[in-house]
Amino acid sequence: IALFPQARHPLLYYWWFEHSVPAALKKHKAELFLSPDGYLSLNTAVKQVAVMHDINFEHYPGDLPLLTSLYYRHNFPRFARKAERLATVSEFSKSDIVERYNVKPEKIDVVYNGVNELYKPLATDRIEQVRLKHTNGCPYFLFVGMLHRRKNIANLLRAFDTFKSNHDSNVKLLIVGHRKWWT
């Protein structure tokens, strides 16, 4: 079964995960609950697997609205302990979860982000069209991600500046992403 996403407000998280999710799991006699966002229900005996991409909110709690930060920091350690298994996207995040939440490393699987098979190399003429559109035909480095200070874009710009200073190159830097908590 697939459940519709819960509301994205911390006051509603509790109701969703402690009432709605357990009721749906019971109704459908589910054997496992997979949460791709890391949230779990503390109110069900059904086995659960959480995907915790990172726990950056532990290190930078001010990057989130106050209620969200409090909810995450209070509950994610509990979710990590409750989960039958955890998945995360890097060895760094795994180590962070192990150290911060005192979870055994054997409980955590590192599963790297995948790429849909629809994404494949472009034909040469299409590559040239893209270059002409975005960089007047120049080669480029591409950053795709949330535009947020925790994504370290300042160092990306410094690194690109260093590259340009050390190489006689017409390479451009393209930055693509959604402004999130922009300051």
Language-model features and meaning:
Residues I1-T183:
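Carbohydrate transferase catalytic cores enriched for Leloir-type hexosyltransferases
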